[in-house]
């Protein structure tokens, strides 16, 4: 007795799911910045020390360059990028100011605790022109935060240090539980 096989095409599935919340947030940020005139640039997840550290003024003695903080591959000749900043460097090597770039993607650090994971997503922008001020950067950040979370969100800027920006700050938003949550660094 022969077995009959159904060779008809599969039924179309109407609801195929939805965008992951991380991708939704990344797309929202990127689309907002595109509306402000930023251009999307992309770069590799496997980087060299030159682009990931050296060109960003991160000294050889900096703790972030140690094996316990960075995922090195290929006999330590390459690494999984620890931030999306190398993408900006690559963009600046290709285009002269004025320029406005954004990039988004996965980054990797040897962090694993209640508030950190070894892989996370980052969106980063750079704007280079004459007569650009920190006040303009703050205004842009307020516009982004209010667009994403509403104008009733409370935020604060805290002075910080990043080897590749001066001045630098970290930005926190106040959670519904009354705790400050760091959401970005800038400079």
Question: What does each model-identified segment do?
Answer:
Residues 2-187:
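TRNA-recognition modules of translation machinery and tRNA-sensing kinases, especially anticodon-binding
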